């Protein structure tokens, strides 16, 4: 009867669960972290280390977090945690953007606009309460993601202290000469009733009318003469323009030409029976005339744009308004006619060229901009013939104007086109340029543009193309419109002279005095402030500004209002946001930082892509392809979500689907199972008593420590350059190849069959201990919950959380004089592969069942054979085969052959050995197993 030797084996045993059961375990861990004050402990533990500050770009305090939020916060968390392990003090202060239009809209839906049910102060209070509620909801979900930070003391742009610091930041901008006021065309949303910043604009397709309009020359003969032509009697001359905004024609004050463009004087369509010649850019003449129904291009002269400068035209429907021909750099021969109608109240370039020619001083505000904040023509807008424009909305006016121009002779062509057009990012409605009195941070007045472009060069951009992208945006951007005509925000707390409109000469001093009061009572203090308290007798000559600051200024000055305020260094080490923030937070922070300190507020900028489905489509409710982070955490757990984010190439669009999540769940299981196998074999191991020194280890164990050392160097470097996908790939490869397919398989024999305290067994356990200690650190920034769980099961004393530790210091490379070098192991592992290939057909044809049933012969050149023969007795353990013989042969190649063994099988270790039955007390055991049970035990040097 076969004796049961199971009790003599040391099989794996651990209480570390096979299943992660993350949706249940993670919330319990979160509760423990909160209870123990994990973040405060982390800060105390890191005290005195070098600082690494990742400054949080604030999400908007409105609505539930979505997948993009999760990507952003988890990427930040991975970096912060990896910096902790790298020996830094890495504080993380989360923040929220709390002012602005979306919150106003939410309150308006409930209470109506300001003045309906609530006065301005009550309205602001409701906004404050709403934002605070939204922060609480978002904070709960961010914590659930496993993101560690100062959640009890975040920064909020609605906090009185922040609002005060923002006003102090404005004082610095004013002090450095960057603030200006003027009537300039700005992006205007009629639904918001306010100016918009560049970052608040998004582009979408829109169908617009296109019209070609003729501007008749006041002196046709003089125009013809400029072309070297003589005008026949009764022939008129006109300059046609092409536009997609007919509603701007009432504000048309000039026509711009290109100075060096070539123009031709050509025969055009008759004007109500009268012959007419047209001035068109030569490159566009044929195409334009075709639109007007003229097939043949008959040219009467050539001229450069410079020859026509300051000649006068008539407005197409306001005959009394003379229209000068100006020269502008913005005019090209790409499309249209080469002549651009110029309405300085409705376009940046129009404004600049009109200002250059002194045109703005000739007209009143209502002529420059006849459109009010709702998009309606002012009462003073002159009619178009019998057609009343006053009170008409501009989007309706397009068709009305076109209809009214039929039959007047000036409408040469009309059509429609679909094109990309700026829309309000909140309302998704088309916006317009509209000249209004606004406050600006000038890009030129104190060299802000040049200084910002220089500062960009000092920053390390991830990916590298981010540098060219933001530089191009800064180089071409207009002045920053920082004023808004809204209620919920931080006031531009300036006093302006009632007659001159100039800010008070002591503005920076006054701003700081206002800030001190706001810090105590919030922004309402400004609106209730009696100017005489600060200005004394001068109060009668000054008005308080009621505009508020752009929310991008709110978030843009967090480097001052948060970092400096909390004693953290500036510039921050890293800003990390989505790729849209080159025109948003990265840029507003850069401009405010340079305006205040002549330096970028960050050393590094990292951007991530947007989330899309597996087909590359944007996720949306209408497509039904959206995946919410809350759902992932409920079904799979936060660590699966975190693993997907780490494994994705975040520099591009990040694809997610249920299938992708399933693959990441499978990857998680492989990593968890590896950890569990390590822990199972560390049962009964105490590093204080049993740890075998590296130099005394079995060489295979020493090799796996070497491989772990190589991997850790790779992982640490990848964390430092934010390449998390490489880390995940390297970890999975190490677990499946180095450990799963080789080391863990080979060492089972030693771990299970040797005496519990045998050196060979303790050597394997020591190697596994080193690997486990390193492994828990490697995964901690990504799989934070699992790492914390694993940390609690490791042998030895482990206090607190793995993040209190640093990268593991117990690993080391194989020394150059090792009995087996890394190169030796590479050759042996190649030989192992060769053996496996020889055994495969033997298994397939039934010659053997398992590799242990095959005896192996290796024939190699003399030198290689001499190197391997001392290992021959133990090679069977590396190959997990029967006995191995190494012979020398006169060949440069290595030959492997195998034959089924005839030796008996040991029932305990399953090896086929001639010594089975040699001990009558254990007739079914090999001599090695007998020694391991009752004798001194076997010795192992190599494997």
Swiss-Prot record:
Binds 1 zinc ion per subunit. Its EC number is 6.1.1.5. ATP binds at residue 621. It catalyses: tRNA(Ile) + L-isoleucine + ATP = L-isoleucyl-tRNA(Ile) + AMP + diphosphate. One of its GO terms (molecular function) is aminoacyl-tRNA deacylase activity. It is found in: Cytoplasm. A motif ('HIGH' region) lies at residues 59-69. One of its GO terms (cellular component) is cytosol. CDD domains: Anticodon_Ia_Ile_BEm. The keyword Ubl conjugation does not apply. Catalyzes the attachment of isoleucine to tRNA(Ile). As IleRS can inadvertently accommodate and process structurally similar amino acids such as valine, to avoid such errors it has two additional distinct tRNA(Ile)-dependent editing activities. One activity is designated as 'pretransfer' editing and involves the hydrolysis of activated Val-AMP. The other activity is designated 'posttransfer' editing and involves deacylation of mischarged Val-tRNA(Ile). Monomer. Belongs to the class-I aminoacyl-tRNA synthetase family. IleS type 1 subfamily. This is Isoleucine--tRNA ligase. It comes from Xanthomonas oryzae pv. oryzae (strain KACC10331 / KXO85). The gene is ileS.
């Amino acid at each position: 009867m076969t004796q049961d030797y199971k009790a003599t084996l040391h099989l794996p045993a651990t209480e570390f669960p096979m299943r992660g059961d993350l949706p249940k375990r993670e919330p319990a861990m979160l509760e423990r972290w909160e209870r123990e004050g994990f973040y405060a402990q982390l800060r105390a533990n890191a005290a005195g280390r070098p600082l690494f500050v990742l400054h949080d770009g604030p999400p908007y305090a409105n609505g539930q977090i979505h997948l993009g939020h999760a990507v952003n916060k988890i990427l930040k968390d991975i970096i912060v945690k990896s910096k902790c392990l790298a020996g830094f003090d890495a504080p993380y202060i989360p923040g929220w953007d709390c002012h602005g239009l979306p919150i106003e809209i939410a309150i308006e839906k409930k209470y109506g606009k300001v003045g309906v049910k609530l006065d301005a102060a009550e309205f602001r209070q409701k906004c404050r309460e709403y934002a605070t509620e939204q922060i609480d909801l978002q904070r709960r979900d961010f914590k659930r993601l496993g993101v560690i930070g100062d959640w009890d003391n975040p920064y909020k742009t609605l906090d009185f202290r922040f609002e005060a610091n923002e006003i102090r930041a404005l004082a610095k901008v004013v002090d450095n000469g960057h603030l200006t006021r003027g009537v300039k065309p700005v992006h205007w949303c009629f639904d918001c009733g306010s100016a918009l910043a560049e970052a608040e604009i998004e582009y979408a397709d829109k169908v617009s009318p296109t019209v070609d309009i003729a501007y008749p020359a006041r002196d046709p003969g003089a125009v013809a003469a400029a072309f070297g032509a003589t005008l026949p009697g009764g022939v008129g001359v006109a300059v046609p323009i092409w536009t997609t905004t007919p509603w701007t024609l009432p504000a048309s004050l000039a026509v711009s030409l290109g100075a060096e463009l070539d123009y031709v004087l050509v025969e055009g369509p008759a004007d109500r029976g009268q012959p007419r010649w047209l001035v068109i850019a030569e490159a566009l003449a044929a195409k334009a005339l075709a639109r007007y129904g003229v097939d043949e291009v008959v040219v009467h002269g050539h001229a450069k744009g410079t020859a026509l400068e300051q000649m006068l035209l008539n407005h197409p429907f306001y005959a009394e308004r003379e229209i000068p021909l100006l020269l502008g750099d913005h005019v090209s021969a790409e499309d249209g006619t080469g002549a651009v109608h110029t309405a300085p109240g409705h376009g940046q370039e129009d404004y600049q060229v009109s200002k250059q020619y002194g045109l703005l001083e000739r007209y009143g505000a209502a002529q420059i901009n006849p459109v009010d904040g709702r998009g309606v023509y002012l009462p003073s807008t002159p009619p178009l013939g019998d057609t009343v424009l006053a009170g008409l909305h501009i989007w309706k006016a397009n068709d009305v104007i076109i209809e009214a121009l039929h039959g007047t002779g000036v409408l040469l062509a009309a059509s429609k086109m679909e094109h990309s057009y700026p829309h309000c990012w909140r309302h998704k409605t088309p916006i317009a340029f509209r000249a209004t009195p606004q406050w600006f941070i000038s890009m030129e007045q104190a060299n802000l543009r040049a200084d910002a472009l220089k500062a960009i060069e000092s920053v390390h951009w991830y990916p590298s193309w981010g540098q060219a992208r933001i530089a191009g945006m800064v180089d071409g951007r207009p002045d920053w419109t920082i004023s808004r005509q809204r209620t919920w925000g931080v006031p531009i707390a300036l006093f302006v002279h009632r007659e001159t409109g100039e800010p008070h000469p002591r503005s920076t001093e006054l701003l700081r005095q206002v800030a001190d009061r706001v810090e105590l009572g919030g922004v309402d203090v400004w609106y209730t402030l009696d100017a005489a308290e600060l200005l004394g007798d001068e109060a009668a000559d000054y008005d308080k500004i009621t505009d508020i600051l752009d929310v991008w200024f709110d978030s843009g000055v967090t480097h001052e209002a948060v970092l400096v305020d909390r004693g953290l260094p500036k510039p921050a080490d890293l800003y990390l946001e989505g790729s849209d923030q080159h025109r948003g937070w990265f840029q507003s922070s850069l401009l405010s930082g340079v305006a205040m300190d002549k330096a970028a507020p960050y050393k590094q900028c990292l951007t991530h892509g947007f989330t899309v489905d597996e087909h590359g489509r944007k996720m949306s409710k209408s497509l039904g392809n959206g995946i919410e982070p809350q759902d992932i955490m409920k079904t799979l757990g936060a660590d699966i979500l975190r693993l997907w984010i780490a494994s994705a190439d975040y520099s591009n669009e990040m694809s997610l689907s249920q299938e992708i999540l399933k693959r990441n769940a499978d990857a998680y299981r492989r990593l968890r199972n590896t950890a569990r196998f390590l822990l199972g074999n560390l049962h009964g191991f105490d590093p204080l008593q049993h740890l075998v020194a590296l130099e005394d280890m079995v060489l295979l164990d020493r090799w796996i420590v070497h491989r772990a050392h190589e991997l850790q160097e790779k992982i640490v470097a990848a964390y430092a350059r934010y390449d998390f996908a490489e880390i995940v790939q390297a970890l999975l490869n190490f677990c499946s190849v180095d450990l799963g397919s080789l080391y863990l398989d080979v060492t089972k024999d030693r771990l299970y069959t040797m005496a519990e305290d045998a050196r060979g067994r303790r050597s394997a356990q020591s190697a596994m201990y080193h690997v486990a200690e390193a492994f828990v650190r490697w995964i901690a920034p990504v799989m934070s919950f699992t790492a914390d769980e694993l940390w609690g099961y490791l042998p030895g004393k482990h206090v607190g959380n793995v993040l209190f530790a640093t990268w593991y210091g117990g690993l080391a490379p194989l020394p150059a004089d090792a009995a087996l070098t890394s190169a030796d192991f590479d050759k042996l592992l190649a030989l192992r592969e060769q053996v496996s290939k020889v055994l495969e057909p033997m298994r397939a044809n039934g010659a053997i069942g398992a590799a242990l049933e095959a005896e192996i012969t290796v024939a190699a050149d003399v030198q290689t054979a001499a190197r391997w023969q001392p290992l021959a007795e133990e090679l069977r353990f590396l190959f997990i085969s029967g006995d191995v013989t190494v012979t020398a042969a006169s060949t440069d190649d290595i030959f492997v052959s195998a034959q089924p063994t005839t030796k008996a099988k040991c029932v305990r270790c399953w090896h086929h050995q001639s010594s089975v039955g040699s001990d009558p007390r254990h007739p079914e055991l090999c001599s090695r197993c007998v020694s391991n049970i009752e004798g001194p035990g076997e010795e192992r040097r190599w494997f």
